[in-house]
């Protein structure tokens, strides 16, 4: 049986790995997932990620998670907002800071995948992929 929401699977893998205090987690690769991970790296929620080929034509992402000096995870909450069955869109007027600007929405816009802060600077709205705090 095929998986219907591979992005939610990646977010769940990250959430579970951080709760288990793992340093690395792997997930199947796609360009959309890589763009989302780029945003998470820029915003300081994860340390880095590396894409490598597992088999001929099959790529996997190795995600290095980030923790505070006390050992607490940088990601307290990471949830999918827009799902394949229910898409959620926000215009620039309705795009407000998440969790008093301590968290972010990751948004797919006409100018690419970006954080809500970047979207407000550029004056664009779009589909809310997930929220991270």
Curated annotation (Swiss-Prot):
One Gene Ontology molecular-function label: rRNA binding
Gene3D superfamilies, per database record: 3.30.1370.30, 3.30.1490.10
GO BP annotations, alphabetical order: translation
One Pfam family linked to the record: Ribosomal_S8
Keyword presence, Ribonucleoprotein: yes
Superkingdom of the source species: Bacteria
GO cellular component, one term: ribosome
Alphabetical keyword list: Ribonucleoprotein, Ribosomal protein, RNA-binding, rRNA-binding
Annotated PROSITE patterns: RIBOSOMAL_S8
Family matches, as HAMAP family: Ribosomal_uS8_B
Subunit structure: Part of the 30S ribosomal subunit. Contacts proteins S5 and S12.
Role played: One of the primary rRNA binding proteins, it binds directly to 16S rRNA central domain where it helps coordinate assembly of the platform of the 30S subunit.
Protein name, UniProt field: Small ribosomal subunit protein uS8
Organism: Orientia tsutsugamushi (strain Ikeda) (Rickettsia tsutsugamushi)
Gene name per UniProt: rpsH
């Amino acid at each position: 049986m095929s998986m219907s929401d591979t992005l939610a699977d990646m977010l769940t893998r990250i959430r579970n790995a951080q709760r288990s205090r793992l340093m690395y987690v792997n997930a199947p690769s796609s360009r959309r997932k890589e763009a989302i991970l780029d945003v998470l790296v820029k915003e300081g929620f994860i340390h880095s990620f590396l894409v490598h080929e597992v088999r001929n034509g099959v790529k996997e992402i190795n995600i290095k998670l980030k923790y505070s000096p006390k050992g607490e995870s940088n990601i307290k909450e990471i949830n999918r907002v827009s799902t394949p069955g229910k898409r959620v869109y926000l215009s620039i007027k309705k795009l407000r800071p998440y969790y008093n600007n301590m968290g972010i929405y990751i948004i797919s816009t006409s100018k690419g995948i970006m954080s809500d802060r970047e979207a407000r600077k550029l004056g664009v709205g779009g589909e809310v992929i997930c929220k991270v705090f």
